[in-house]
Amino acid sequence: MGEGTPGVDSARVQEEGGRDQSLGFVEGRIQVGRIVTAGQLSLCSEEQSPQPGITRPSPGVVVDGESSGLAEPRVEATPQPPSSIQKRKRDESLDSEDDLAELFEPDPQPVWSVEMLCGLRMRLKRRRVSTVRPEHHKVFTKLLEDPVVKKFLTWDKMLRVSDKYLLSMVIAYFSRAGLFSWQYRPIHFFLALYLANDMEEDNQAPKQDIFYFLYGKSYAQRPMFHKLRFQFIRSMGWKIWVSREECEEIQAYNPDLWVWARDRTNLT
């Protein structure tokens, strides 16, 4: 490992973790609840608004030639202009359009490819459909420019915990966590990287370097880190295994990204 003073420049990451322990795992559902509530209110206002041309009988109206009392003038309800209702609908939908589009994207459909042809018989093989979308690559690339993340990757010169396959798994985990793009922070990068080392590395000692970089020799913040890691795994539905094929597909999306050069086989 390289030399440096770990735990100093990571104060912002610790402060973010202490300020919001949920780290967006619940914020997405709360936001959706607000959006649905606003939609229900607008729907109720339409149902309760009177329709044009509908009148209700009032006391004193003559029915079958008999009068039930003093007649009162009929007043027709004046409905709201349709243009104002449509405008209010458009205004309410503008704030939630992007989030809903990202949340309710249809699941990828299975893809079949021909594996073998033998005479008139054909054998099909089901191809795996990746759940990684362009916004997940964009979030990952943006986090690579964070000063703490950039310093960590420079610090791990021997690629003990951050080679190209482990970093590919970070993107895969981002695609499964179910968070909105704007909710990802540097702490999510370290949570995903720690989990990737948990899954792939036989030697579990190097992943302790992540703690050493973030918190130094202090053990006070480690229980909180593990709590956030558990929340992160649960948000993925416990789907934490990533195949080598998926890692290579993730790297092929943007092969010129500089982190894909972090190959242990090239170390001398």
Curated annotation (Swiss-Prot):
A single GO cellular-component term on record: nucleus
Self-association state and partner proteins as the record states: Interacts with CDK1. Does not interact with CDK2 in vivo.
Function: Promotes progression through the cell cycle via binding and activation of CDK1.
Renumbered residue ranges of the record's region Disordered: 1-26, 43-97
Family: Belongs to the Speedy/Ringo family.
Pfam families: Spy1 (PF11357)
Main location: nucleus
GO BP terms: positive regulation of cyclin-dependent protein serine/threonine kinase activity
Organism per entry: Mus musculus
Annotated compartments: Nucleus
Protein name, entry field: Speedy protein E4A
Expressed in which tissues: Testis-specific.
Annotated region described as Speedy/Ringo box, given as residue ranges: 134-265
Keywords of the record: Cell cycle, Nucleus
Compositionally skewed regions (Polar residues) per UniProt: 43-52
Listed transmembrane segments: none
A GO MF term: protein kinase binding
Gene encoding the protein: Spdye4a
